[in-house]
Amino acid sequence: MFKFNDEKGQLKCSFCGKTQDQVRKLVAGPGVYICDECIELCNEIIEEELGISEFVDFGEVPKPQEIRHILSDYVIGQERAKKALAVAVYNHYKRINSNETKEEEVELSKSNICLIGPTGSGKTLLAQTLARILNVPFAIADATSLTEAGYVGEDVENILLKLIQSADYDVEKAEKGIIYIDEIDKVARKSENPSITRDVSGEGVQQALLKILEGTVASVPPQGGRKHPHQELIQIDTGNILFIVGGAFDGIEQIVKNRMGEKVIGFGTDNAKLKEDETYLSRVVPEDLLKFGLIPEFIGRLPVIATLEQLDEAALVSILTEPKNALVKQYKRMLELDDVELEFEPTALIEIAKEAIERKTGARGLRSIIEQIMLEVMFEIPSRDDITKCIITEKAARGEEEPQLQLEDGSIIPIKTSA
C-alpha cells in the first residue's frame, strides 16, 4: 500500500508520490491525497474519453476582437486574415442564433471563406484554431482527393462523414461545425473556357461542392459509401456548416497585375518581389479567381476572401518561440521530462528559419528541420543520467557540428563523443 507520508513526515500524493513541497496543492480525501498535477491529468483523460461533449452556446459567441486575440495566441502575424476570419465567424454563428431564436424578415446568407496564401503560412492552423475557440466539430479534407460522384476517388459526401465522426455521430452538433478544404486551387479549371470532356478532378469537383457549400440536406453513408452500398444513410443539413477553403493559388498575383494594367519590371531583389507579390495578393477579387479557373457559381458561395502573407525570417523565429504550442517550448518540455534543460541559441533559431525559407515550406517545415537536428539528442539522452543540459548552436542548426551536451561536472562535449 502507498504511504501517505515520507520519512520526514511530509504528506505525499497517493498517485504520483510527490510531496506537498513539490506541488502547488494537495487535496485530502478519506485516507487518500491527490495533487493538482494529477487532478489536471485526470481532467485531460476524461476530456479525451468524452471527446466533444459541450459545444459553444451560440447566444454567447466570442466577439471578433476576442476571436482575433485568441487566434494570436497560436498564429503569429497574418493580422489581416485574422480580422477577416474573426468577423466572418462571428457573423456566421450570430446568423445561426438569429435563425434559431425568431422568425426573420431578412434572410441572412452564409459567409463561407476562401483563404489564399503560400504553403506553410498558417491557413490550416487558423481554421483548426477557430474550431477550438468555438468548441465545434471540425474536419479537414484535401480537394485533390475528391472526385464527382461515379468516378474513382473520394466523394464529396465523405467530407461530411468526417465532420459527423468528429461530432461522435451527433448530427445536430455536426450541423454547426466547421469544414476546411485544403488545396482548393488544385481543382481550378485549366482554362476559362468550359472543358469539352468531363473534368473529373477539376470543374466536376467544384460542381459537386456547390450544393453543400450553399446549404442542402445531404445523404451521407456512415461507412463511407461505395464499399457498403446498402447501408442506411445519415441525413445532414449543411445550411449552418461553415466552409473554409484554402490554397496557395500560385500565379494569381500575375492575374491581379494584368487586371490592374501594371507591367512587371524584370529586376529587383527577391525581397522586393516578395513584398510586391504580397501587395497584389491582398488585392485579389472574385474576378481574379474566375480567371484562375474557379467557376462563377463556386466563387459566389465564397463571399469572404482573406489573404495570408509569405512568412519571413522574423515571423518564423517568432513562430518557433512565441505561441502557446511553439515548437521550442514543446521540445524543451520533452527534454525536461528527462531532467535535461534544452537551450536554442538565438542564432540557431535564425538558421532554422532560413532553412525553412530555403525549402519553401514555411512554418509547416519547421518541425522536420528541428527533428533532424534533435534526432541524436533524443536518442542519446534517455539512456544517460549525467547530462544536465543540451545546447543547439548556430553551427549545429546548419549541420556543421553536433549539438553540445553539458554534464554534471559542468564540462561541455559534442554529443557523438559522449557515448
Swiss-Prot record:
InterPro entries: AAA+_ATPase, ATP-dep_Clp_protease_ClpX, ATPase_AAA_core, Clp_ATPase_C, Clp_protease_ATP-bd_su_ClpX, ClpX_bact, P-loop_NTPase, Znf_CppX_C4. It comes from the Bacteria. Component of the ClpX-ClpP complex. Forms a hexameric ring that, in the presence of ATP, binds to fourteen ClpP subunits assembled into a disk-like structure with a central cavity, resembling the structure of eukaryotic proteasomes. This is ATP-dependent Clp protease ATP-binding subunit ClpX. ATP binds at residues 118-125. One of its GO terms (molecular function) is zinc ion binding. The keyword Metal-binding applies. GO terms for biological process: cell division; proteolysis involved in protein catabolic process. ATP-dependent specificity component of the Clp protease. It directs the protease to specific substrates. Can perform chaperone functions in the absence of ClpP. Keywords: ATP-binding, Chaperone, Metal-binding, Nucleotide-binding, Zinc. GO terms for cellular component: HslUV protease complex. NCBIfam families: clpX (TIGR00382), PRK05342.1 (NF003745). Belongs to the ClpX chaperone family. It holds the Pfam family zf-C4_ClpX. PROSITE patterns: CLPX_ZB. Zn(2+) binds at residues 13, 16, 35, 38. CDD domains: RecA-like_ClpX. Residues 1-54 form the ClpX-type ZB domain. The keyword Lipid metabolism does not apply.
